[in-house]
Amino acid sequence: MSIPDTEIPVDDDGYDENGYDRPSKSQVKREMHALLDLGKQLIELSPERLRQLPLEERLYEAIRTAQRTTGREGRRRQIHFVGKLMRAAPADDIRRQLDVWENGSREETAAMHRLEGLRERLIADDEALTELLSRYPGADVQHLRAVIRAARKEAQQNAALLQGQEPQRKQYRALFQALKSLTQ
């Protein structure tokens, strides 16, 4: 049986190389502070978002109470209570979901970038439409051509604008939405 690199080697008596049988106080404090910080992040969330997380009812109610508490000392005590309840919560799952909400999933972001690049190619070149139609043979060709034509016309009009004038983006967005609905 191999020992993972992240664990401290333990001998037959159950002690690590430093002679301790449990994590150090400093390590425990770091973990508790991390849970407290996670609890503070949860307190800042809306009730709708909180309901989407895998929280026990007691923790959910403690977070809602902290959100309603206005007094400084009472709020501080409630935050620490939330931190204490966080010890039993699935912190990794919660962090993962918060990361998705804050940054979006990488797959979604990559898909959006691909669609934006395709939109630029469609506006610039007719060959891109042929490529697109070969990938999606069931696409509404007439609608796509109309949206592309309108986006090209809009791009030409935007190129002729004077400095300080606001460019139009309606057809540009419509083309993106058409591509998005096509790929879903």
UniProtKB/Swiss-Prot annotation:
InterPro entries linked to this entry: DarP, DarP_sf
Alphabetic keyword roster: Cytoplasm, Ribosome biogenesis, RNA-binding, rRNA-binding
Positions of the UniProt region annotated as Disordered: 1-27
Descriptive protein name: Dual-action ribosomal maturation protein DarP
Compositionally biased region (Acidic residues): 8-18
Location in the cell: Cytoplasm
NCBIfam families: PRK05255.1-1
Physiological role: Member of a network of 50S ribosomal subunit biogenesis factors which assembles along the 30S-50S interface, preventing incorrect 23S rRNA structures from forming. Promotes peptidyl transferase center (PTC) maturation.
Matching Gene3D superfamilies: PSPTO4464-like domains
GO MF annotations, alphabetized: ribosome binding; rRNA binding
GO cellular component terms attached to this protein's record: cytosol
